[in-house]
């Protein structure tokens, strides 16, 4: 992947899980989102500065189209990587992750994909770290995130960059400029979640596919 190349990142997940809020945390400066009316898509240019140079993601956001059924193939075509997002306070949004993954891989096949559980700032968490195993079945990465607090915002993008470059040594040399947090996280709770995520990764996978 050349440094100047722009990367198409497909962002999918149920309506209301926080996809647009997440992508709009990044203050893109001179780059403005553009709307593609034929697909009902907003494309957000997100720039990250790494030890391998500038990385330019064009993040394709559904702009609510997922509420009207499946997305058109044109949304996925030529996708270089993807984020599947669910809401940790909504079990159904996690149960629907396999459907989004199936749609993605049907069109894009072998692209790097990150699974993100959003809204970990909300106290009433329904989907516990120990229940999140889909990513392990399909060799995806997983991160707890919180769009409203910027928690772990950059991690999915750094992981995707490392996969696209084929180099695990990717790091940010400059933190992205983000909107000010709208909520303050409980640091003790986040530490607990991080431990639970790490502990869950060491457990054997359940034999059935019904994670919840």
Swiss-Prot record:
Residues given in the record as GTP binding sites: 14-21, 64, 118-121, 146-148
Region (Switch-II): 64-80
UniProt key word GTP-binding: yes
Keywords, in A-Z order: GTP-binding, Nucleotide-binding, Nucleus, Protein transport, Transport
PROSITE patterns: RAN
Function description: GTP-binding protein involved in nucleocytoplasmic transport. Required for the import of protein into the nucleus and also for RNA export. Involved in chromatin condensation and control of cell cycle.
PANTHER family named in the record: GTP-BINDING NUCLEAR PROTEIN RAN (PTHR24071:SF0), RAN GTPASE (PTHR24071)
Self-association and partners: Found in a nuclear export complex with RanGTP, exportin and pre-miRNA.
This protein's name: GTP-binding nuclear protein Ran
Organism: Dictyostelium discoideum
């Amino acid at each position: 992947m050349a440094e100047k190349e722009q990367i198409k990142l497909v962002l999918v997940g149920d309506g209301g899980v926080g996809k647009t809020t997440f992508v709009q945390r990044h203050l893109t400066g001179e780059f403005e989102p553009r709307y593609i009316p034929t697909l009902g898509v907003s494309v957000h240019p997100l720039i990250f500065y790494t030890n391998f140079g500038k990385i330019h993601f064009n993040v394709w956001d559904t702009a609510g189209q997922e509420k009207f059924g499946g997305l058109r193939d044109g949304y996925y075509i030529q996708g270089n990587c993807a984020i599947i997002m669910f809401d940790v306070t909504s079990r159904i949004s996690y149960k629907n992750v396999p459907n989004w993954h199936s749609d993605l891989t049907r069109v894009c096949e072998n692209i790097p994909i990150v699974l993100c559980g959003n809204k970990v700032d909300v106290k009433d968490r329904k989907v516990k770290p120990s229940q999140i195993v889909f990513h392990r079945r399909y060799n995806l990465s997983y991160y707890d995130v919180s769009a409203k607090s910027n928690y772990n915002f950059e991690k999915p993008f750094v992981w995707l960059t490392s996969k696209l470059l084929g180099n695990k040594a990717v790091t940010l040399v400059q933190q992205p400029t983000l909107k000010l947090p709208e909520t303050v996280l409980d640091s003790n709770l986040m530490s607990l979640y991080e431990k639970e995520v790490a502990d869950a990764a060491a457990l054997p996978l359940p034999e059935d596919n019904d994670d919840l």
